[in-house]
Regions:
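Nucleotide-sugar donor-binding and catalytic loop/hinge architecture
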Residues: 1-2, 160-179
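A short, glycine/small-residue-rich beta-strand->loop->alpha-helix junction that serves as a flexible
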Residues: 6-17, 41-44, 86, 186-193, ...
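Donor-binding and catalytic core of enzymes assembling or modifying cell-surface/extracellular glycoconjugates
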Residues: 194-285
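Conserved nucleotide-diphosphate donor binding/catalytic pocket of glycan-assembly enzymes
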Residues: 55-154, 173-174, 178-187, 286-290, ...
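Histidine-anchored nucleotide/phosphate-binding helix
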Residues: 14-27, 198-202
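Short internal beta-strands
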Residues: 33-38, 107-108, 213-218
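Nucleotide-sugar donor-binding patch of glycosyltransferase catalytic domains
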Residues: 109-113, 270-344
Length: 344
């Protein structure tokens, strides 16, 4: 059968959706799977064994009613899909199912305006759901017997060879541990204080003097944050500030060399997890870590304000005050136990 899977979200959400794609291929090995997503994150999914075709939408297309609906119409008129899975089910995505009434399975979310578009509607996100369990629920109308909760990404051997040369040119010894530290975040409300990041970085170095620390950051504000943490660490020689992943695809390649990831919870952590790498993250206040961090055979843990302060007491307090209560001493205690338990 031919499957059209629509996932217009950010990087982390799209990476998590690979559990659904993998499950399709495991249950229907002859499946022809097309993945629809935002153009800017498309390189991350090239060559994925559970994806046969990728269709991208630019920001311009997604934010223009006529361009958006016109392209959705062309997609389902060009090819007939037996199964359409709309993981967002918004006004901006439901055109795929609306323009393809002959598709046997039109699966979407249960919303007030989706009743006449999808012939199989799945409950919206509920308390107790995880991102992975909710994604896999969208396959239940198909009667699949095996649902694979694992997320995955792929890179080529050539990409790894080229990036290995780059790392060595930057002074990295591939025989020694590489610790990737996500020192910043795109959104301020997801960024743990930089001085706390410096504290943990210094503790990681003290624990494993042979470890090589690489910072993950984007250009602009995040790069400035990385430089500030580097300053706070006294320009420690264990930190290789010049090593960069210049794209999401390069970050995926870098992940294959990483021994351990520490940082703010977000898309970078999902990439590490998809490559089977252990991770520990600080979760921003107000987010439930059990929702976003998979519980599978890949070691992963977190520190959350909910462990220190009841959620109802957090209401109304500014983010900087909430983050200040997630002390570096508390986080390091949990990180050290995690490292001990996983032989890191």
């Amino acid at each position: 059968m031919k499957y059209l899977v629509i996932r217009f979200r950010q990087m982390g959400d799209a990476v998590i959706a690979t559990c659904l794609l993998n499950s399709i291929k495991e249950n229907d090995p002859q499946a022809d799977v097309t993945f629809v997503l935002n153009q800017k994150i498309e390189p991350l999914f090239r060559g994925h064994p559970s994806i046969d075709h990728i269709i991208t939408f630019t920001e311009r297309e997604r934010h223009s009613l006529w361009r958006n609906f016109g392209k959705m119409w062309r997609v389902v008129r060009r090819d007939h899909y037996d199964v359409i899975i709309d993981m967002r089910s918004t006004v901006n995505t439901m055109g795929f199912a609306l323009f393809s009434p002959s598709s046997r399975y039109r699966i979407g979310l249960e919303k007030s305006y989706t009743r006449w578009v999808y012939n199989h509607r799945i409950h919206r996100f509920r308390k107790g759901d995880t991102a992975i369990s909710h994604d896999l629920d969208m396959l239940r109308p198909l009667g699949f017997k095996r649902l694979d909760p694992h997320i995955s990404l792929s890179v080529t051997d050539d990409e790894r060879r080229r990036y290995a040369r780059y790392l060595q040119e930057q002074g990295i010894d591939l025989a020694k541990p590489i610790v990737l530290v996500g020192v910043s975040a795109k959104l301020d409300e997801k960024r743990w204080p930089l001085k706390y990041m410096a504290f943990i970085t210094q503790r990681l170095i003290a624990r494993r003097p042979e470890a090589q620390i690489v910072f993950n950051y984007a250009p602009g504000k995040e790069a400035a944050d990385a430089a500030e943490v580097y300053d706070l660490c006294g320009h420690d020689a264990h930190i290789f500030l010049g090593v960069e992943a210049k794209s999401q695809r390069e970050l995926s390649v870098l992940a294959t060399f990483v021994t351990f990831y520490f940082g703010n919870e977000g898309g970078a952590r999902h990439i590490m997890h998809a490559h089977g790498k252990p991770s520990f993250v600080v979760v921003s206040p107000g987010r439930d870590p059990r929702t976003w961090i998979p519980c599978d055979n890949v070691p992963a843990s977190w520190a959350s304000l909910d462990e220190l302060m009841p959620p109802e007491e957090q209401l109304g307090l500014p983010y900087d005050e909430l983050y200040a209560r997630i002390t570096p001493q508390f986080v390091w205690g949990k990180v050290e136990r995690f490292l001990d338990e996983n032989g890191l």
